[in-house]
Structure formats: structure tokens, C-alpha cells
Regions:
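Secreted/periplasmic proteins
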Residues: 2-117
Length: 117
């Protein structure tokens, strides 16, 4: 009886720990946002991102949230733009989001991990 209870608890814990969306590895760069493809104005201090053109064009991603994880930490960004030069697994984020998750802007382009939230 006790071993069955432990199995049920472990199964539930594992299911809760699994991310709802798969994680994606991609190249992370930064840009200076303005009026993006989603028609809103944003600045360097906003936690925003542009996703690759192919991904952006495949659905309605404006205002969706992404959790970006890098060497410096994690940040939640909002999709506000389309990145013409990005592959579908890459992100172009505001300078503030880049610094919070990836590190100094001088790094330029780094690999990061992200998923939809």
C-alpha cells in the first residue's frame, strides 16, 4: 500500500514538473524595438521579443509570452515583432531582456533556451 502511494506521488510530481511547451534552443540577439509587426510601440527597457519570420507568419503570436533562459538568468518576454533575419528557433529581444537573461550586450549573439508560457 505504501509503495503504491509513493508511486502515485512521484508520478504526479513528475507530471507537474514537465514544461507545458517543449524548450527550444536558438540564437539570441538584441534589437532596439519601436513600432513592431504587432502594431505597438516599445522601447529598449521593455521585456519584448521578435520571433522568426516563418514562425510569426504561421500563426497569431502577438502578445504571447516566452520564457527565455540564458547564462545570466531568466526573463519573460512578450512577442511584439517579427525578426526578418531570424530562423524559427531564434529570438531577437530588447536590450533589457538580453541583459537580464543572456548577459552584457557586448556578447552580441549567444545560444539560449526558450519556451512558450
Amino acid at each position: 500500500m505504501f509503495s503504491k502511494l509513493i508511486l502515485v506521488v512521484l508520478s504526479a510530481t513528475t507530471a507537474l514538473a514537465a514544461p507545458l511547451y517543449p524548450r527550444t534552443l536558438g540564437q539570441i540577439t538584441f534589437y532596439h524595438p519601436g513600432k513592431g509587426a504587432c502594431e505597438d510601440d516599445h522601447g529598449d527597457a521593455d521585456m519584448v521579443a521578435a520571433i522568426g519570420r516563418g514562425l510569426y507568419d504561421s500563426g497569431d503570436y502577438c502578445d504571447n509570452k516566452i520564457k527565455l533562459t540564458g547564462a545570466a538568468g531568466e526573463v519573460i518576454v512578450t512577442v511584439v515583432d517579427r525578426c526578418e533575419g531570424c530562423a524559427d528557433n531564434d529570438l531577437d529581444v530588447s536590450p533589457a531582456a538580453f541583459e537580464k537573461a543572456m548577459g552584457a550586450q557586448s556578447l552580441g549573439r549567444v545560444q539560449g533556451e526558450w519556451n512558450w508560457v
